[in-house]
Design a protein with these regions (language model features):
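Conserved motor-coupling elements within RecA-like helicase/translocase cores
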Residues: 1-9
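Hydrophobic "anchor" residues on beta-strands that sit immediately upstream
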Residues: 8, 36-37
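Inter-lobe coupling linker of SF2 helicases/translocases
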Residues: 10-15, 24-33, 50-64, 94-175
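Walker B catalytic acidic pair
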Residues: 40-41
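Residues immediately C-terminal
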Residues: 44-47
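Conserved helicase ATPase motor motifs in RecA-like P-loop NTPase domains
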Residues: 64-78, 86
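Conserved AAA+ ATPase core "coupling" helix
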Residues: 78-82, 102-103
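A short helix-turn-beta junction within AAA+ P-loop NTPase domains corresponding to the substrate/partner-engaging
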Residues: 81-97
Length: 175
């Protein structure tokens, strides 16, 4: 008798970028309400504008239990955390949208893309301790040193020549 048992459906995260994959996952979760959704390599859902991320967030409402796993350090950008945490529970961070989250934890710089188009890019991050406190209430982190015996990293500098347009764009990013 499988009544009451947790249902597991395994699928590649990339499939959720497709209509067919999203539909299949939705049908499974809908018909098996006692389920768990686990996103491995959860940084694949860090872009709040991506179709895959939007689909994953829609699926969250059909999932009884939700978990995320990642081997990537959290420190790359605090903005990467919003949709990952939102998948787990949209109340964890206390923000109704990515933009309110970004405005709390990031100071941005307007970047001219040319042709009258602009985008906001992070200049620096603020209130990081506050964010870490929120994360500590629902996350668990293990470092490589705590679980793996790896040799020390080797670093080498690589210098790349840029053309004039690349140099100009690079300088805009550094501001």
């Amino acid at each position: 008798d499988s009544k009451g048992k947790l249902k597991i459906f395994c699928m590649n995260i990339e499939a959720l970028s497709t209509t067919r994959g999203f539909k299949g996952a939705t049908e499974f979760l809908y018909h098996h309400p006692n389920n768990i959704a686990i996103i491995d390599e959860s940084t694949t859902i860090k872009n709040h504008k991506a179709i895959r991320t939007k689909n994953v967030l829609k699926l969250a409402s059909y999932s009884k239990y939700r978990r995320i796993l990642t081997g990537s350090p959290v420190t790359k950008s605090p903005l990467d955390l919003y949709t990952q945490c939102n998948f787990l529970d949209d109340k964890h961070l206390g923000f109704s949208s990515f933009y309110t989250f970004r405005n709390r934890y990031c100071v941005t710089h307007k970047l001219d893309l040319g042709g009258g188009k602009y985008t906001e890019i992070p200049k620096y991050y603020v209130h990081i301790k506050e964010l870490e406190e929120k994360l500590s209430k629902f996350s668990y982190r293990v470092t490589k040193d705590e679980c793996l015996d790896l040799p020390k990293k080797l670093y080498s500098k690589r210098y790349i020549d840029m053309n004039e347009d690349q140099e100009k764009f690079y300088e805009q990013l550094r501001i």
